[in-house]
Amino acid sequence: MTKALWTVAEVARALGLAGDYPETPIDLVTQDSRAVKPGSLFVALSGTPSGGFVSSFASSRDGWEFAANAEQAGAVAMIVPHRVDGISVPQLVVPDTLIDGLWALARAARARFHGPVIGLTGSAGKTSTKEFIATYPGASASPSSFNNFWGVPLTLCNADPSASVWVVEMGMNQQGEIARLTELSQPTVALVVNVQPVHLEKLGSLEAIRKEKVSIARGLPSDGILVLPVDLAAPEWPGRVLRFGAGADVHAMSKVPAGESWDVTADIAGRHLAFSLTPGAPHRLHNALAALASVAAAGLDPVLLARELGEVGIMTGRGVEQRIGEIVLIDDSFNGNPASMAAALDSLQARPVRGRRIAVIGDMLELGDEAPAYHADMVGHVTGIDGVYCVGPLMRHLFEKLPPEKRLGWHEDPATLDASQVAALLAPDDVVVIKGSKKIFWVNKFVQKLAAALQASN
């Protein structure tokens, strides 16, 4: 992209502001003063979300308090709730910097783009699938996991107007959030990667989760296409549906190990194509098929995406393997729910090993009243695993059901888990998987600590 994303004058018009504003170019829209660089538009969001949204990262400070920092870093304009003293760049004053500012600019961004837009959601694998689709030539996609009430509008505001396709990831922290995000994004293709028992504590049932995820179709035009797994119902959507998975419109015909990758042959709605895929978590092929189905639904050439899939690495914390001495460590710590936990354990059980198969697994959060049962039920997925170390209060329900010979230990508080003690339980030729909800291992950087402890013991 050679032309600037916006000018200050264009932003002012998008916000409905009267007056004369300069044609100063803007190359980045951000709400984070630490991310500001020369040519940025700084959006000073409130520390407490407005618009009825909720956030687990609410702040006691408001964005306008960092206006001076943003200007010093190179901001050429800023959206603020009131004029801030000492600021020399244009201040675009609106009553609510989220709804009247960031969301209004996002609507203007979407209105000026006339190419295909793929919106996607799901209980797990959203970001990995988005990264697959983002490799399509000329695509513009959400950075990182920008999938909430500020991440989605930022994605739209920063998307390249000349892109071949926009890719917009959508998540949720409360019921009804996906419907609002999809109505803002107005996708031409909507993808639901999967529906799993995640956020049960917030939504109450798997059916409520299904409804929330399928509500992404509310943003589709009448001729839009909803892309779904083969086993997911969506009676709410009366329009066209394209399905992926075994026996569906888009499915894998074969998957053959080929050195450090898989050679896959797939049927994409009657068109056969071959591609390579880096091995990883069991759902990796599922996500690749979802990406191919979405690209085909958008009227793009899936062959162009297939050529790129083999170059997409595994994202940190989502099944990345590393060998430390004679031990293989599988980092699947980014998140965990009953479906992905079972898949990770089943994959470990099926893996040929010279030593032992070891699982270090932590609590799966936000499962509501059924949480103890979901944890205890994992006992059916460790039959072929030699040792299990449980972390967190909920994992005690599994620990107590384990055969004594499989019990490596149970630690209640993830924050005080000693990586060196876990490392001492491991032996040469062991294959170890680390899996749990984000707050158990990922936030505490446990995998890095365990890797360091193993390296120190070599």
Annotate each predicted stretch with a short phrase.
Residues 19-29, 100-103, 147-150, 170-175, ...:
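Short gly/ser/thr-rich secondary-structure transition/capping motifs
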Residues 1-19, 36-43, 47-63, 188, ...:
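ATP-dependent carboxylate-amine ligase
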Residues 98-230, 234-240, 448-457:
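Phosphate-binding loop of NTP-binding sites
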Residues 2-119, 128-132, 157, 400, ...:
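Short, basic phosphate-binding NTP loop
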Residues 87-95, 139, 238-253, 402-412:
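Active-site regions of enzymes building and remodeling cell-envelope glycoconjugates
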Residues 76-82, 194, 227-230, 358-362, ...:
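Short internal beta-strands
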Residues 11, 40, 70, 105, ...:
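Residue-level signal for inorganic ion chemistry
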Residues 73-76, 89, 115, 220-225, ...:
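A short helix->loop->beta-strand "cap" motif at the edges of active sites that frequently abuts
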